[in-house]
Amino acid sequence: RLVGSEMCIRDRAPTEAEQGACLDKALEDINTASRFSERKGDVWFNRAKLIYGVAAADTTLNKEQWTVDAATEAIQKAIGEEDLPVYRQLEGDIHFYKGDFEQAFADYMKVNDSDMASSTSWYWAAKAKANIRGANFGDIIALLDSAIAKCGNPPTNEAAPYILERVDLRLKLMQYKEAVDDYDLYYDLLKGQVGDRFFYYREQAKFRMSDFPGALADIQSAIRLNPGDPTYPAEEASVYIRMENYDQALRSLENALRIAPDFASCYRLRGICYVRQGKKAEACEAFNKAKELGDPVVDKLIKEHCK
């Protein structure tokens, strides 16, 4: 065991010279262990794991034997001795760190084809795939599906970050219903212990799938949890506008402006409400206030309704 050298590396020697001696001692321990081990692959694996851990944690090291490339060489020698999934997992991690995402993906998929496949190995395969130029979002979702499936049925809390990453991909693909389903799964997983941002993000997905009652319920939950954020009553107003409830939208905008008097888009939304109510003068006054405050899209509305 490398107890002494591992503690030395972990605690960091106070001077550069002492750190160098510490690292040399660690390699000496590995070399000593190799003379007594019948599994040469494990020796190279432990060497690669130690070197990679140190090199990734301290990028200022300039010792040739303590670089990520040295870790790559060591893990490849381990695989040359015996091609084990645990070795491939580490090789994948090293390739990922170096930005060699295609190689990392190939390694993780070798792990996934073995009995060592886990939610983590599927997740990192998805992360590697996502970093490959031109990767198909559907393929990445399928990999995340496998990661989540490895978390049990129903899934454990371990699946939570994987579900949120799948939500992001579904939103990019405009799969709003599926995204909402994933948000619901996440909510159930956390037994409802979520914050205001969760309700805001789920509201956005429901809004895009035209579930306005559902969107309204979620944005109102966000307001209850964080009444000081002006974004939420402004978003509530947007929902009311889509529901053609302009009086209530105007009340929501008043609430937002009470918190943030210079919230430009609120004046634009107020103008839209007045247009829908046939109040041209009030609408143009609101649009001009939005323009004064720097709203980037109000010029088109002014040109359309106030010229």
Question: Could you describe each region identified by the protein language model?
Answer:
Residues 53, 97, 131-133, 172, ...:
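Register position in tetratricopeptide repeats
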Residues 2-9:
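Short, small-residue-biased leader/transition segments that mark boundaries at the very start
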Residues 36, 80-81, 113-115, 150-154, ...:
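Structural marker of alpha-solenoid helical repeat scaffolds
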Residues 276, 280-307:
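Terminal, low-structured helical/coil segments at or just beyond the last alpha-helical repeat
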Residues 40, 49, 56, 84-85, 93, 116-120, 127-129, 154, ...:
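Residue-level recognition of tetratricopeptide repeat
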